[in-house]
């Protein structure tokens, strides 16, 4: 039988062995605060300038931008509240939640987690619609705002159903804890003196119809979506390069710059792919430890946090709106003469198009999206 001294020594050694895990958990918490906090500020600013600085002829496209911004904002808020740490546990999806949601309930934490996952999947569809929109503007003219609202709402209805499927399949907390204890005994998660009352939630098994549908929706469509995005991107660029449309160089440059913006936005989900790769490797036991457990969702947090930067960089009215806000703080003073010269450059009247669809395309780009 071990003496008190030996017990104390063994416990000290155990706690010492868990120090790296403690450190990585703290790093994960602070990364969540920084990344999501940054994203919340940027998306709030973007929503503000969309309402205040969107020109009349750009309103239909602003529906897509607003959809991006509002879901990115809510995703950052939900992820900050959850701050989930993935516990790779075979066929179960188990998460320890370090965010403020843990002070309310494990159900709220899982709700936030489900919202984050479904919102990121929904953003892929809005990105696809954005590329199709840009092409249709060139060949048919811009659709009206009401039509865009209907299209976006229909696509979100599909995502909302998947969200409910995923959330309703929430597992029993005690069962998930027992799975975690059995598969990860080295962490001693059952020791309250070390970990306190940890908040755990997730799916007991992924082999249920709701979970399988949700996982399929959030992972499988991304490949065909990106093929279609690439198709419409190439068609748009080839249309701009052809002589079929009678446009001024400034108008063509405007369209090309917006396509560049969408292309960069399409590259942002690389964080999702890297996170998915880490998740897969850890799920099959190829890698393990507190780094993949904490880094997976922090990488995904970078998607909604960085997305608004594309709009601010490439869309002139929003960039100007942001600079006006910053100039009021005294950090930055706007150079009126430089901005005026840029605006004057792109205010040159375009050549007359040969049909009404081309006129609408010119109006949508040259008059409202001067960059």
Swiss-Prot record:
Its main location: membrane. The keyword Cell inner membrane does not apply. The chain crosses the membrane at residues 31-51, 62-82, 109-129, 148-168, 209-229, 267-287, 295-315. This is Serpentine receptor class delta-1. It is found in: Membrane. It comes from the Eukaryota. Residues 344-371 are annotated as: Disordered. Residues 354-365 have a biased composition (Polar residues). Signal peptide: none annotated.
